[in-house]
Amino acid sequence: MKGGSLSFLFVLLIATITSVICFSDGMLPNGDFELGPKPSDMKGTQVINKKAIPSWELSGFVEYIKSGQKQGDMLLVVPAGKFAIRLGNEASIKQRLNVTKGMYYSLTFSAARTCAQDERLNISVAPDSGVIPIQTVYSSSGWDLYAWAFQAESNVAEIVIHNPGEEEDPACGPLIDGVAIKALYPPRPTNKNILKNGGFEEGPYVLPNATTGVLVPPFIEDDHSPLPAWMVESLKAIKYVDVEHFSVPQGRRAVELVAGKESAIAQVARTVVGKTYVLSFAVGDANNACQGSMVVEAFAGKDTLKVPYESRGKGGFKRASLRFVAVSTRTRVMFYSTFYSMRSDDFSSLCGPVIDDVKLLSARKP
């Protein structure tokens, strides 16, 4: 009986561990594409068997790319590991994953364009989908990390990454690597902050070896944000940065406004008409060689505040606050950077001021 009990406990322990692994945040099975096709499933760089790459199903013209491979005069570099995949015209990759129905999830993946065309990616988990433009390159390596969110409609999610492009040269398709997932837990307002997720602690998965931050593109038409409670209301992306690779004013995460007035973030808060509120926040730099004069513009309804910040590119921050009287039951809080900035160490990577620790509280009467 004792041996039977031990056997049962062992089986239960294994089942528990398996369950935890199944739903843990991190890289998808073979999300880095390091497990590749057999030589018999290849024709040059093209993968000719739709199930040749473990854990993935392919459709259309998909290439298996080795780091250092040449495309004309261009050397193709992989951000991590040795391999990535390239999606030709109308090509796609997909993977089915066990999830929890009703939960919110964020996908993170690396992408790089290989030609001058206006390349885009269509990311979908039915019924949600979104088109992500990758024409703008934010880092000097050519690779950027992107995030996209969805809500699980069932216990199985079919994740599809599709290239909707129609380039004349199929070799002009985008490169994909490092596909990861993270469960999102929508935050709630508290008696210490009317805004939700004001410290940006809840957000997309950041790959441990990623030193560029994660781009959250504009999702005006999408139902879910990978940065819960916040909307990217601009033409360009904002960047989600972590304390492991950047200077962060508070906690472990923050947001970098990397594209001037084209990079804005907003949240709508419930307010009482005629009541006075104080919007407070931190402005700084990410310790990423982003130097020079910066200005963050903060908006609360019809009121605005410009906060200058002189950056040496070595980290640091200052605090600011905006006092206003609510004129509506719903007040839009928004931030953007007045100027465009480039990193001084490579002059090709977009950067900008960091905002963090955003709080909205009702003010006491004097």
Swiss-Prot record:
Residues 1-22 form the signal peptide. It is found in: Secreted, Cell wall. Glycans are attached at residues 98, 122, 209. The keyword Secreted applies. It holds the Pfam family DUF642. InterPro entries: DGR2-like_dom, Galactose-bd-like_sf, Pectin_Meth_Modulator. Interacts with PME3. This is BIIDXI-like protein At5g11420.
